[in-house]
Each structure stands twice: as C-alpha cells, then as structure tokens.
Amino acid sequence: MAMWMQVVIIPFLVSFTCVWLIHPAIAKMAIIRGLTDNPNARKLQKSPVPVMGGMAVFFGIIVSAGVTSIVFNSYALFTCVVTMTVMMYMGFIDDLVGIKPWIRIAIEVAVIGFVVIMDLVNINDFHGLFGIGKLPVYVSLPLCAFSGVGIINAINMIDGVDGLSSGLGIFISFVFGCVFFYSHDFTMAVMAFATMGALVPFFFKNVFGHLSKMFIGDSGTMMMGIILCIFCMRTIDNTSRVSRAYPDLGVIAFCLAALSIPVFDTVRVMLLRIYHGRSPFIADKTHLHHVFIRLGFSHIGTTVCINILEFINVLSFFLTYWLGASVTLQFIVVVLTSCTTTIGMYFFLSYLDKHHRTNRLITTVSVYSQRFVQQRFYKAMTRLMDKGM
C-alpha cells in the first residue's frame, strides 16, 4: 500500500467517518442530560447548545490512531493519546463546573512535562534564529512549559463563533501534516491528518447544523491545544526530522506562522486586559472575531475571513522561505505579517465600528455573509447535517 494512503487517506477517512456517525448520538445525550452552554451577556448564541463536541472529535482521533498504530508502532502515538485524554477530561470538567485558572495551568504544565519525558522532545534548539543554537536544559524546559501553556490557552480562547476554532484547527493540522509527511515524520503526519479528519464533520455540523449543532467546548479546545503543542515541540526539537529535511526552514517561524491568529490575538487580548486593570483570565468581547460580529458579519463570514488571514500569514512565511531568506528574516516577516493581520486588523475594524465609518469591501463581505445563511445551499446543508436527530 502506498505510504500516502497509510499516512494521509486512511487516518483522515477513519476519523471523519467515526465523528460523522457518533455525533448525533452524543448531541442527543447532551440534550437529554442538560449538558448545554447557556446564553449570557458575553456569549453570542441565543439558545442553549450542547457542549460535548470535543467528545465526538476525541473519539474519531482515538479510533484513527488505534487503527494506524498497527502499522506505526510509536511512543509518540501513545503520548498523544494519553495527553489528549487528560486534557479532554479536564476541559469537560471545566465545561460542567469550572476549574480555577491556576489549577488548569498546573495540569497543563504537568501534561507538557509528560510529553517531554515520554516522547523526549522539547523546545531545546533555536536552529540559528538570531544566531542561537542549542539551549541549556534550565532554559529549554521553562520555555517549553510557557510556550505549551500559551498554545493550549490560545486555542481555547479563540473559540468564540461557529466553526472558528475547528476551522483553524483543520487548516493548522493540514499545514503540519504536509510538512511532517514530506519530512518523513509519518507518526506525526498520521496524528495531523486524523485530527483534520475528525474536525471536518464537526465543523460542518457546528456551522450548518441546527438540531445537530454542538459546541466543541473546553474539552475539544484543550485537546486540540495539546495536539498542536506536541506538533510544535516535535518540529522544533533538535532531533526534528523537519529541520533535517529542510535545514534552511525556520522551524520556529513556521510554528509561529501556523498558530499566528490564535497566538497573536490572545497576546493582544491579555495585554489589553492587564493594561485596563482586569484579570487576563476573565473573558470579555475584545477578540478579533467579536469586532467582525459587531460589524455585521455572520458567524460563517467571520470564520472564513479569519481563516483567510491565517492563510495569508502562512503563505507569507513560505514565500519568504522559498525566496531564500535567512531563518531570522523568516521569523521577522512572520511577526510583522501576523501583527498586521491580528493587531492591526483589530484596531482598523474597531475604528470603523466606533466611528460608524464604512468601507466598501468590508460592507460588501458583511452583507453577503448575512445573505448566505438565507440561501438554498445553506438550508440544504442544514437539512443534511440534522439527519439522524
């Protein structure tokens, strides 16, 4: 069997099929048990929505990983499954009763430590960024913990409108999956495409479903966060197959580009909260997706626009790499592009909203995104997604 079938197609199809089949049953159970996210002044939904989407995604990834582990016997798959399970259950408890921020952070640090010990990967090499190579242990371990906690919570905090976190998760998993595949890191490629396959059916049901709509919840975003954290650690580690296959590729710049929208938007939001004397962990409506909604965009319009911004950041990185830029220049370009598409875009859109200014392009896209949800295609997709409910 061709390697691309084993690494790409089979993991994707197995996880996709599992989530598609089990999603209605989990949604029904959540409704019966009252496991729903209820609307309030901060949230954007107008009615209670089941919050167990992360369970469906988890099931798809686990089954896919189990099937492919027959071919790829790797500690990395075991590590991914264990850490996903811990983070999924922690997020589920947080969805139900809430967990104090410091307890969540402590668990996240412990899980990241488990990854470092079991999988022997770490953020221990800058690969020439600013002339820095291998890092001593007393620097790499705290950096790994800090970065990992940041990635997990960035994915969690970006989850604000239908399809946004899952849409970004699909794109980011695809990008990592392609890089892992062409670097011959097939174990991580399997996890990336299994994650992508599990998120695709959830995305469609989350965006188009009515009766079948579920939120991914903290259980799903925490699980996605640790998977993406492992992808980054695997890419940056000094034994990375990616850096061996592509020695001129800035692996830190690549990871930052792949996670640019969640990371840079979260950093901006937390700094603004601290500046205004508020706790960085108390949710508000200052994320990039909130300003799109205030300007009249639909949820799907907001999701599409933010994914386009993410695509621009990743494309700018690869263009810089293909043009032969140094590792440091690749990093600088990613930072500048990401700041423009997140911080710059937020303040530009906020200015339009605050001063009631109009922009022809923004207005056109906003109006079309609202009309889209009234078109026949959207309604047909809703009927398809709600089958079995």
Functional labels for PLM-detected ranges:
Residues 44-50, 130-141, 251-255:
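Short aromatic-rich membrane-water interface segments that cap or initiate transmembrane helices
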Residues 38-52, 213:
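Juxtamembrane helix-capping/reentrant segments at transmembrane boundaries
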Residues 2-29, 33-34, 58-74, 78-89, ...:
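Alpha-helical transmembrane segments
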Residues 63-75, 93-99, 116-130, 236-239:
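Transmembrane alpha-helix boundary signature
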Residues 82-90, 107-122, 143-153, 169-175, ...:
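Membrane-embedded alpha-helical core segments of multi-pass
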Residues 49-66, 113-118:
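A generic, lipid-embedded transmembrane alpha helix
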Residues 97, 125-135, 297, 318, ...:
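Membrane interface segments of multi-pass transport proteins and intramembrane proteases
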